[in-house]
């Protein structure tokens, strides 16, 4: 009985750690598109204090290659997000985003850890060639590894419950 409880706990911890690793990895170093998008953010002044908030986003807004790389930087889900409206709205003075602070944030931060857009404000999604404003598609599918880990966790839970009976 104690063995089953320890085994269940160990498997749950490993599964949670793997999910955290996968979600972090999905936008940084996942594929060459992610690396290129990150490099282009750096080139626009992500780490440069002399680059203003609007200049930074203006640089990204006009960079079609950056936007293309960002759209292709998606390894674990099938979400297709067009972030150009968000980036360009941050580049204008009269945007709804305003000046909350003087620091810049990575465009990669538009997504939360679960790969869904962090906010519907200014976010557009693209489906079948049409652009639908302010819709959050969320995560459509996940990788085989994530499905395996989820199934494994559920199976482990059932083994634990059966062990209690």
From Swiss-Prot:
GPI-anchor amidated serine lipid attachment residues: 143
Entry keyword annotation includes Transmembrane helix: no
Keyword ATP-binding: no
Signal sequence, renumbered to the chain: 1-16
Expression triggers: Up-regulated upon milbemycin A3 oxim derivative (A3Ox) treatment. Expression is also regulated by CWT1.
Location (main, coarse): secreted
The record's account of how the chain is modified after translation: The GPI-anchor is attached to the protein in the endoplasmic reticulum and serves to target the protein to the cell surface. There, the glucosamine-inositol phospholipid moiety is cleaved off and the GPI-modified mannoprotein is covalently attached via its lipidless GPI glycan remnant to the 1,6-beta-glucan of the outer cell wall layer.
Propeptide segment residues: 144-165
GO terms under cellular component: extracellular region; side of membrane
Keyword annotations from UniProtKB, A to Z: Cell wall, Glycoprotein, GPI-anchor, Lipoprotein, Membrane, Secreted, Signal, Virulence
Cell compartments where the protein resides: Secreted, Cell wall; Membrane
Membrane topology, as annotated: Lipid-anchor; GPI-anchor
Function: Probable GPI-anchored cell wall protein that may be involved in cell wall organization, hyphal growth, as well as in virulence.
Protein family membership: Belongs to the IHD1 family.
Name the record gives this protein: Probable cell wall protein PGA15
């Amino acid at each position: 009985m104690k063995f089953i409880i320890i085994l269940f706990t160990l498997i749950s911890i490993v599964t949670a750690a793997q999910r955290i690793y996968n979600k972090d990895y999905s936008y940084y170093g996942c594929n060459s598109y992610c690396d290129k998008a990150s490099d282009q953010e750096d080139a626009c002044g992500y780490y440069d204090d002399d680059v203003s908030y609007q200049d930074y986003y203006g640089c990204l807004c006009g960079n079609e290659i950056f936007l293309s790389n960002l759209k292709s930087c998606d390894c674990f889900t099938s979400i297709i997000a067009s972030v150009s409206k968000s980036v360009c709205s941050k580049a204008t003075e009269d945007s709804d985003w305003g000046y909350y602070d003087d620091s810049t944030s990575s465009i990669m931060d538009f997504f939360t850890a679960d790969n869904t857009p962090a906010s519907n404000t200014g976010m557009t999604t693209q489906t079948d060639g049409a652009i639908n404003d302010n819709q959050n598609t969320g995560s459509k599918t996940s990788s085989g590894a994530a499905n395996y880990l989820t199934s494994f966790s559920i199976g482990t839970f059932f083994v634990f419950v059966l062990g209690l009976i």
